[in-house]
Amino acid sequence: MKKNFIKKAATALLLVSTLALSACGKKASEPVKIGVPDDGTNQSRAIKLLETAGLIEVDPAAGYTPELKDVTKYIYNIEIVPTTANTLTSTLGDYGASTINGTYAIPYGLVPSK
């Protein structure tokens, strides 16, 4: 059940973020900053999303709840920046990409299914 929920949550976030994340850091001279929620549950989901998108590698021992310390490799030149979840929409301009929960994305006009 938990595995399926995390997979669905990551897929929903992936739908919102794929275009922005796919080009992150490929030729950037400075790291591209990616905003992620700073609370444990949502940060784990964001890390799994970034792993699924092929931007980072995570220690398999972390399972379904990885933390930033579990990131073993950055595939691209990115920097993961923990930020209060409810401010990620209003700080979009501060980051190259953000992983935003539907709870905050939808009221801001971001549609996860598009």
Model-flagged regions — what are they?
Residues 2-11:
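Bacterial N-terminal signal peptides that target proteins for export
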Residues 19-23:
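C-terminal motif of bacterial Sec signal peptides marking the signal peptidase cleavage site
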Residues 31-72:
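Bilobed "Venus flytrap"/periplasmic-binding protein-like clamshell domains
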Residues 62-90:
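Short helix-initiation/N-cap motifs at beta->coil->alpha
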Residues 88-113:
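A ligand-binding cleft/hinge motif common to bilobed small-molecule-binding domains
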